């Protein structure tokens, strides 16, 4: 593994422990080396870096919409020629969406295509049991189909998804 960048005194430290010590995200067997991997909700790129090291011939597309996480993801991707960082959120349509902070550190936010207002905040707070606050971020989204078309991918070998509960919005 090549050196990685993390932010001290943040949730990055817990993420390092989860990825590299608990290995709950990455401990699996695969019969053949994958060609195409998508890391959705890449955060600062730790899983992407692990995949790039483990599968040096695979193309790894790393999606992360949150700006501060994406900046660190870009730093961590620089050491690997096979990681392509993209600052977009995975969604069911190519559009823009709002990001709401959950006040849970740099990993905690909720993406929605609903505009922020007190009703949205109350509804999302009840659904997620969180204190939702506007983060004033609008991010571009992309579909799996668009990613595959943009990178001439015919088959995805591995898809890692960690998107703060938005999985339901994408796959419903």
Positions of predicted regions on the chain:
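Phosphate/nucleotide-binding beta-alpha loop and adjacent structural elements of enzyme active sites
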Residues: 1-172
């Amino acid at each position: 593994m090549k050196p990685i960048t993390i932010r001290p005194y943040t949730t990055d430290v817990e993420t390092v422990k989860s990825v590299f010590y608990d290995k709950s995200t990455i401990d699996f067997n695969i019969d053949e080396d994958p060609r195409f991997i998508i890391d959705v909700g890449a955060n600062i790129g730790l899983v992407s870096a692990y995949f790039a090291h483990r599968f040096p011939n695979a193309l790894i597309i790393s999606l992360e919409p949150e700006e501060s996480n994406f900046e660190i993801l870009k730093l961590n991707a620089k050491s690997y020629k096979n990681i392509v960082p993209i600052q977009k959120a995975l969604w069911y349509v190519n559009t823009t969406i709002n990001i709401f902070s959950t006040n849970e550190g740099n990993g905690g936010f909720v993406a929605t295509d609903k505009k922020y207002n007190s009703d949205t905040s109350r509804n999302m707070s009840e659904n997620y049991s969180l204190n939702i606050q506007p983060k004033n971020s609008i991010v571009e989204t992309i579909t799996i189909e668009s990613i595959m078309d943009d990178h001439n991918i015919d088959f995805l070998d591995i898809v890692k998804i960690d998107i703060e509960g938005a999985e339901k919005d994408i796959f419903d």
